[in-house]
Amino acid sequence: MDPRMHCTDLYFRLGDDEVLVLDCREPEDWARHGLHIPGSLWMCFEEILRDSQVLPDDELIVVVGCAPDGSDARRACRLLRQRGFNVVCLEGGLHGWVTHGLPTESHVAAASMSGLW
């Protein structure tokens, strides 16, 4: 079983310099939902696979997905753990976050890592 963090635990750590929230949703899911956890970084799986070296290796990375079974976040977590990162999955993903009534921000569809290159 992959290590997980509960939504309320993450909420109390938002803004913590030692925590990075990594949203691993695919572009179509990112665009469809139109919202994200405040301060999160969006990198789809392909970007994580290609560009994980840009992620901090001295922070806890909390991976957020939107697949009902959590498979997208688990896949990203496993890859990052294999590459030596300290990583956990957000329990319930984005759906769990929203269900708990926790804050979100709206975004534009093009705000991914690929826009930085």
Question: Where are the predicted features?
Answer:
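Conserved beta/loop motifs at nucleotide-recognition and modification sites
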Residues: L22
